[in-house]
């Protein structure tokens, strides 16, 4: 028996005779898991054998009883070295199992606890009667029984049930006989009753016929019963039950149709006590129509049976009846004109703290008839844009504000300093102990001080004070002071007077002096004694400024660091003496290190410029009053996030003062300085502070309730008095008092969502700091912070009297709302930056290139297209966007990289001519590179110019060049050409950082910002929060409730970030604060770029956003160019070998069986995925135009599956004729004869998935026009299925890049494989890759099997893709070499003849930095030992061992120390 286990047995007083049993001989505690919040302890014991049942029960009962006394729940399990499977022991433990949850459920226990068990063939067999639903119990209860036996110490048992025929017959016989007896008795009783009834009834002359059974009447009665049935709260349902009625809201719905045509709807409902999964089958059309009422957000009454779902294993209601009910929502019942305005409301942009979207907040205020509502998120304004748009739509005023973190710029070390020599001064170092932190609501219980001169204590003061009431346990626990200490203590006023006399002619000193001085002054004021006027030194601020490198400056940490005795921290006499010792250490260091000799110097010479970083934070609400104020607000938010960020955004008071124009200030919540002053310093001090603000905030008593739990306020009466005091402060300071709600969610029942979000922050968050100490300490409850109606607010403040309550709730809030002007948060126009002569330059570059290709004069079709585009581009101010993109592309080209275009920019011929994109949107055409003669095919017969047959120029005989993808300009800038151009560009990932810096270089650092994003809590993350809350707070939720809670907690702001390639450019004739505040991404103050504070989507129509994305294709092309010397621009788009890849593998010299796929698509961008390879196999593309179709089909939504795929399979259409890319719709319809405007509109409706959402009248108009122009019905039907379509220009750019890569795969294979593995491959397994074909194929087979069983990891899935290419490479006759310590590169694969040599980074677990370090170290000299490789190369022992296992190190010794024998030779 271990010592720890013996100690536990002593504590629970386990009987000695039981402890001496053989099972206890080696007893030990394997582990104890302590869940501090839920106060659950989990013991894991080890015993020599399974305990006798009596011993187990004794151990169980004593553990439970002992720990219950300390309010701790206990569970335990046992690991037994030897297991006894005797029938008696098993039967005893079987009976015991039904005393433990969840085996003690009523249905399981009543059916099974009396059955017999035996142990046969390594199984525990339960003999059950044959009529028991074995499948139900086997699936739902036996797993729990297995777990319980494992906890008893039997290990993992297999438990099964068998039907006992003898028992079945016996029970059946008993059942039949007992039932027969009951029937006979019932018949006899009925006869006797009938006789009695007949005796009482008058004779009947004529018998009436028996009524027929009326099914309608029965249905009506059932419906009446359903209407009147008792509603069961969902939380009360724990087992299977029949005819249960719920009422609740639907929050999840899924409709299904089975293969047999039956309809089922699965849905989830909540009544806010819990949630439930429900399902309903439709028996007929009438039942099916009822499905329509089961919609998300609907309130229903349902009746059905509760059963265990065999698939989910959870209780589910099979719904028999359903009815929609009216949900009585809260309403603001005050008359119009008498409704409040909420001035303190948080949205889900308050980081990890509040729930409502700004739209839902504004909608609720508008629905209630409020004329305005304020937005006051914590330290950010990210909800402003959406709030601005929603308020305009809802017709109410949005008041834009925030709850700021205000700090003092320089927190003084000394208060009221005078000219005094610090070395010659006398100090009174004092400390107070109190019953709480509120000077107004708590009491002084000890004042202690040490009078010191030149480091010596010359006199001491120490007095206890009787507060007149018993001390709370919390106070005693914190201070160590008991009621006994206070017996016989002097009255407070006597102690105060004596202490004032003690302090005369001295400098007062305290640690965190603002608290001690505030408490003393409040008590002096209360007893008509003079407040403190002599100088005060705060040793807390002294330490912070003198030792900024220390992380902690509390009294405890400082005394430890300076080895000052502090025997009883939080008793005033000990604290005061320790503070005095520290003071003289500080004075000595200040004199020696900083030359501080005079009291005045402490603040002037020692207080650091950045002392705001350590300053105490106070909340204030700041509101935008006018347009000037909005810009100042943006500046303040920016400064708080950029210059003054320290853990959280901070606004120094002087900075606020400098930008206060157009802003209004409120005193905020209980964390505001005015509220704090009322609590800790008194009304006079609060009045002085209140003069800084524009209004005083008071909140419902329920909001302040946590302060009672924290013992800052005594009780409800104390809260009401604080509110009255705040009103008095407003009266004295001549400031209006506004009742605000501190809204964090909209409805009362949403409180749990915030609870889950806030508690997920852990105990490190201030809001979760525990009350008291020890493992059982809990955080204070969160306040009831829902959005209150005017009536509810008036009720909250009814204690003030009707008139005063109405004034602070309604009149003052309405008046203050009227002081605030409407502002424009989001501008209505686009503001592009200015580049000198941008319009002239774009036009000049366009015509210059056009003349170069097509000659001068230009062909009419080219001239008209350029004129049309330039009219739109120059007329709408878009030239600067084009020119900026051209400059960026040109710079990247000059660095040796191609830039691929994305999106629809390839629809613009001007973009093609100035070099932004390679895609030529003109109709397919020939053009002579020598004489510029051209031929255009404009009848739609050719899909791409690259598919035109080769032919010479008829004028000069030079082979024609071929181009043109037939893409209308309208798909880029809209039909009227006024849509803001969104130019997305794919730069090489290697060159992307340089391209980003180019933007700064072109426009200036102060005008270029990364596009900001806001990261919110995803539903999966919220699910984890809910499960953590269950664990930490001892909750248990059924699956449906977990889903509901996770959905409710999702969407809350968690962090900020940046778009991977988006750069926002502010016009150089404005500044960023005209559009948005700025910040660092994810609060990373070391980031090289600042981001927009607003999500970039919120301002993307006001400023230029450049999408400078990183992509592998340009990097791959650059690598192939470096390896081959081939200019990728010269690679033909119609190379026969490349096109052959799409129809077979012969061009690669392998069979489909060798590489496992019928085509050569492996590793080709756009076409190498399993999905697209399948499309290629079905469609057999042979032209560039068909490849464009495939690209469009594979990227669209509902374009291929269930649409084009079926049309092709059924022979209705071909790959060429189906709808593939969005632009094809407009082109096809115009060729069919529709007007361009209508063709464009139809394309827009279809590509956005709106075809079935527009009105039937509008849709029929389009259909009639198409049919009039002989557009086939299948084409029209196909339009109706599409949800999203890919731009043809995007497809063309991607396909062109893909064909260039494919060219190298066909004609320069070893270079292709080198580039692929260097750039695209995501996972490596070098041992397999260098092990030959058999090893590669065996590993692929292994992963294939895992995939079928859903067991493959993400790494294995990535590895499979890599191995497919390795296999193909090996089958083509190339080799994969081993990692070479002296030849391998750090990052890139190397070509050695027909062999690839892998780089160091391909070794699993070896990162880029170590790879580069190894290469650098080997250049300095050979590695003589493994130790040297670890030391110089930076490789870990694990990596060196792995290299050794792969025979990379040869015979390298462990170390390079020579033996004594070696020295002689």
From Swiss-Prot:
Its EC number is 2.7.7.7. Required for replicative DNA synthesis. This DNA polymerase also exhibits 3' to 5' exonuclease activity. InterPro entries: DNA_pol3_alpha_NTPase_dom, DNA_pol3_finger, DNA_PolC-like_N_II, DNA_PolC-type_N_I, DnaE2/DnaE/PolC, DNAPol_HHH, DnaQ, Exonuclease_RNaseT/DNA_pol3. One of its GO terms (molecular function) is DNA binding. SMART domains: EXOIII (SM00479), POLIIIAc (SM00481). Coiled coil: none annotated. It catalyses: DNA(n) + a 2'-deoxyribonucleoside 5'-triphosphate = DNA(n+1) + diphosphate. It is an enzyme of class 2 (transferase). The gene is polC. This is DNA polymerase III PolC-type.
